[in-house]
Amino acid sequence: MTDQKGMFNNIYKNLVTPILKKDIGIDAEYLTNFSLSLLTFSSKNRNWPLISRIIKSLNQEFCVVDKRLHQKICGIDFCNPVGLAAGFDKNGNAANIWKDFGFGFAEIGTVTKFAQSGNPKPRLFRLAKEQAALNRMGFNNHGAENLVKNLSLIHI
């Protein structure tokens, strides 16, 4: 395999950044769900040869191994202090892929005992000028039992 270091940075810079910086009418929640679906599929099929190569490339590009970044907090070891904030993967569908993006931890977060649909749509808004998003999701998730099932399927 050829050296692909920088490939994902180029994809992000040339494809993702223009979409995020300029509001071209793509619904923010749709874009988020689409991205999470791709990541979930990749996470669940990471042993497929093509997906395995892509994930390996992600890992090589984004993961920094440096013992100076290691953290031990409350007896828990973290390879680095950079984490994925709560709310993106509320149901733990892609929980075993976050480390391949270089995260030292991921906070699943926003999980309730029972499933709930959250606030009515629209509830996620892109603020292109501010390069930000406004989140009024309202704790939509499939519930704690579903999260436990998802995490146990991927041995987390």
Segments (PLM) and residue ranges:
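Active-site mouth loops of central-metabolism enzymes
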Residues: N80-K90
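Conserved small/polar residues in nucleotide/adenosyl-binding loops
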Residues: I154-I156
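Active-site cofactor/substrate anionic-group-binding motifs, chiefly glycine-
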Residues: F78, A94-V111
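N-terminal small/glycine-rich loop or linker at the start of catalytic domains
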Residues: C63-V82, L127
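An N-cap/entry alpha-helix motif that binds or orients negatively charged groups
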Residues: G6-Q71, N135, N140, A144
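Conserved, mostly hydrophobic/aromatic
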Residues: D27, L84, A106, L147
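A gly/proline- and charged-residue-enriched helix-loop-helix capping module
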Residues: G109-L151
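Amphipathic, non-transmembrane alpha-helical secondary structure
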Residues: G92, N96, D100, A144-S152
